[in-house]
């Protein structure tokens, strides 16, 4: 299965400790399923692919720490930095009202009928998602991904229409 059909479920941010654990930034709502002990993850990093078996996974200070069977120490864990993990969608991830990050990235941002920029990324926070947008002026801005501000996303047209409150684009 190619990554076009797969979803990114996490990314190695850094190593943790001396026993080969890594900190994983999650991009899945199902970490208990995706990062269960014994699961084999498909990782991609700078053109290289890894198959890694989860030995242990635990939450620590709000972050997921994962120990892979193939990673014996900190040096090996350091080499995984930037590795992105992909997996096929779970049945319940076919939410018609939701969007995957890769579907939003690259969308043209429309305000009052004008193309004002492009979605360059999606940030996930405790209060919800935020679109990272590069305006046509070259300036970067953040737009909360809530229906009141982003009332329409048209994947076929490749656009996200926004109705920002006054001043949001001036920040």
From Swiss-Prot:
InterPro entries membership: PRC_barrel-like_sf, PRC_RimM, RimM, RimM_N, RimM_N_sf, Transl_B-barrel_sf
Keyword Membrane belongs to the record:
no
**Which cellular component terms (GO) are annotated to the entry?**
cytoplasm; ribosome
Q: Could you tell me where this protein is found in the cell? A: Cytoplasm
Q: What is its main location?
A: cytoplasm
Q: Does the keyword Cell inner membrane apply?
A: no
Q: Which family does the UniProt entry place this protein in? A: Belongs to the RimM family.
Subunit organization: Binds ribosomal protein uS19.
Q: What does this protein do?
A: An accessory protein needed during the final step in the assembly of 30S ribosomal subunit, possibly for assembly of the head region. Essential for efficient processing of 16S rRNA. May be needed both before and after RbfA during the maturation of 16S rRNA. It has affinity for free ribosomal 30S subunits but not for 70S ribosomes.
Q: What is this protein called?
A: Ribosome maturation factor RimM
Q: Corresponding gene? A: rimM
């Amino acid at each position: 299965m190619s990554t076009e059909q797969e979803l990114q479920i996490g990314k190695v941010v850094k190593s943790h400790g001396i026993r080969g654990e890594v900190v994983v930034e999650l991009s899945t709502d199902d970490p208990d399923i995706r990062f269960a002990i014994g699961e084999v993850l498909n990782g991609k990093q700078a053109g290289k692919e890894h198959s890694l078996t989860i030995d242990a996974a635990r939450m620590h200070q709000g972050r997921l720490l994962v120990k892979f069977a193939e990673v014996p120490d900190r040096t090996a864990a350091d080499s995984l930095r930037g590795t992105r993990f992909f997996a096929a969608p779970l049945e319940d991830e076919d939410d018609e009202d939701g969007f995957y990050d890769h579907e939003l990235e690259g969308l043209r941002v429309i305000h009052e009928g004008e193309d004002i920029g492009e979605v360059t990324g999606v940030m996930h926070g405790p209060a919800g998602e935020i679109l990272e947008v590069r305006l046509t002026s070259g300036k970067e801005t953040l737009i909360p991904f809530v229906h009141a501000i982003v009332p329409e996303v048209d994947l076929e047209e490749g656009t996200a229409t926004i109705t920002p409150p006054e001043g949001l684009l001036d920040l």
